[in-house]
Amino acid sequence: YTLSLHDALPIYKDWQSLYIYNEENNLQTSKSLMHYDNLNKNFHVKEDISYVNSITDRIGYTLESSVDINKGKNHSLRIDTLESSTTQTYLTIPSKLRNTEWNGNAQLIYILNPENDTQISFDYSVKYENGWKHQFAWNMLSPTNPQTDEANTYSYKINNLTQKQEVSFHFFPFQKTSCDISAGLKETTLKRKEKEMDNYRKTFISPTVAISFVHTDITKSWSAAYRLHNFAPNIVQLRPQIDNSNPYMLRSGNPNLKQSYLHSFLFNCNRMLGKHNHTIGVIINASIRQHSPVAKTTYYNAETYLSGLQYTAPAHSSLISFENVEGYWDIKGKLIWQAPIRSIKSKYALSTGFNYEHNPYYIGENKTTTRTYDPSLEHFLLCNLTKRLKITISANTHYVHSINTENYTSKTFYQTAGATFDIS
């Protein structure tokens, strides 16, 4: 597939093909070449391919590969839900420079018992990223007046290689209850290739663990899960040299930073009540974070020599660096009740929840901890007006109370109401 270029007009090419399936060798492919703009030299190339095959009636394997190369692509901001918290929001966006991402995966599956689908699998995955990213951060202590977090707002180069090996086991320990257990190792290598600085390379090795139980019955169901997430610091947080592009707002990484771990626990239960199809549900989610990397700002009233960085900070300047802190945890709970209203062909749902967050970080040079209390109440009414027209009416009440050890208090009360129409 070729692209011809003309000087006078910008060119927009769009080619997408559906999955191609070959029954003989179980090969699946999809490919798209999108948005080539002659004026801005924008392009986006994406290729996916997968191969599935069976060696015997119990042994099979899957091979997958994908590549995504783009330049100047219009990306939307994405909230980093695992790194963000109630009082801090992180958004990331790839730059409009060239970005490359390649993923590969190989899986071998062995069915131990075909009657109950008990099986074991071995997975190897690899991911390579090369490009630039922008990170934007906001302090949300006052949700109605968010403040830019300059210490955590920056652009950085990505040249990362991540490899992961896992073993997974799927079985049924009890009747109507399935269990999935997986464990393995993850290796992340960060490289830096910047002309003005020496090359830098660091490798992090961490375990991966996931355990889940799912029970399904006619009138009740429940699930419980634990997962260990791990995050390597980015190159800005690790860079051992000083960035003096602004001599009065210096920035330096910390090569001794540890990778952070997030332990997440989830419990979900639903039960049908009586003969009127009323249902009640409970959701509890908790997490504990270790070695959280946070920014710390040090101020210098007089000219100061920084021996570790071999640099002299001018008077009235500041230095942003990074440290690991301990003590982050949160818990979120929600109770949901649903009931049909047959007279108007509708369903009503009432949801009440409570969230608590304990978040340590630095304000300047001082370590502080913010405690956030977040109760909520939500109403939903789903009406089927006709076979093709549905309307959902909702009303939400939300209260956020944050207080930190610097005696700062924020109280915010929200009330929203709305309606949505669905025409099929």
Language-model features and meaning:
Residues 4-424:
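Primarily recognizes Gram-negative and organellar outer-membrane beta-barrels
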